Amino acid sequence: MTETKGYFGQFGGSFVPEPIQNLLNQLEETFEQYKNDPEFIAEYKHYLKDYSGRETPLYFAESLTEHLGGAKIYLKREDLNHLGSHKLNNVLGQILLAKRMCKTRVIAETGAGQHGVATAAAAAKFGMACDVYMGAEDVERQRLNVFRMEMMGATVHAVETGTRTLKDAVDAAFGAWMADLDAFYVLGSAVGPHPYPTIVHEFQKVISEESKRQILEKEGRLPDYVIACVGGGSNAIGAFSQYVGDEEVKLVGVEAAGHGLDTDQHAATMTKGTVGVVDGMKTYAVFGEDGKVAPVYSISAGLDYPGVGPEHAFFKDSGRVEYVAATDDEAVQALLLLSKTEGILPAIESSHAIAEAVKRAPQLNKDKIIIINVSGRGDKDVAAIADYLEAKAAK
């Protein structure tokens, strides 16, 4: 897709204070210098293969397919990456840029903790100091990931302001960056000011580069659907990237409907949001009546973000991607279904995408093919799911 510098259609741009803009210009310069550099690419691919364990399998979910009785379902197994999610794809790329910029300290925000864990690991690997900002609410929900980050030498800062979730962690991380302009900000999703959405796309496109090759090997044709969950949107951008030009492939992004789209307890930016500026970018976001970013909710700490990446906003308006939403309950049921039919425990974020496939597959012919991007594994969610089911049973 043609991108006017920093924009996807009307979306994107860079709405930040001047000191940050100067850093973004340096980052863009470094990225442009190295993104096609054979030595940089070789080093990046080396770490993807030998450190992260790529490529990840494209797995035919035979039992789930039989259970649903419709389209063939394949799972792109990003949960099998080192550390359990797609996040490391992007972090390795950004850390290698940081290294070339001679940075010694990295800052990151995290929601579910997966990006924080990936950043902590890469910082440990390359001998960098690491500070991770995480909403206090998410610290409680994702205690396991907090310990993982700390074990790898990162300092985790619990953010008590606002809704104490991902949006507040992003704000705090930007604040910390303003206070130490020599640090490198490793942004975890395809959001924020230019050039971050473009950089994250570049380092996540490996997902669909692999899945496209793999499905052609297995089925001799492209899929009919690719489905991925959308919070900020990095796993979905990676999963969709190489199919955007293939009009016959339907792309479906699944947001968090929380307690329902008719409540104020959701994070369905595309369905319920309007266009505005949030976190340095012009995109869709959920705003309150006062014009400020509204609190959002999801059982999933990785999806409760009130904005969305500008490239997704562009895909919505152009009609290339269909955006839908799944409730907490639908996501939990999908998580349990995949666990019981395939012995694969997906992250609660990924389970939103699985929930949509569960709705669609039975309505499709058996010769249709769906690829679901399983963006992460669900070990981190076991306690929260147990609490959810217990509370539901008590009602």
Where are these regions (language model features)?
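Positively charged, low-complexity intrinsically disordered leader regions
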Residues: 3-12, 25-103
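Active-site nucleophile and cofactor-binding loops and adjacent substrate-binding regions
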Residues: 77-88, 106-115, 162-163, 204, ...
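A short, small-residue-rich loop immediately preceding and capping a beta-strand
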Residues: 82, 98-135, 222-235, 251-254, ...
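Short glycine/serine/threonine-rich phosphate/pyrophosphate-binding segments
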Residues: 88-94, 108-126, 140-143, 229-240, ...
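Active-site/ligand-binding-proximal alpha/beta "capping" segment
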Residues: 180-230, 312-314, 333
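Claisen-condensing/thiolase-fold acyl-transfer catalytic domains that form or cleave C-C bonds
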Residues: 230, 234, 328-387, 391-393
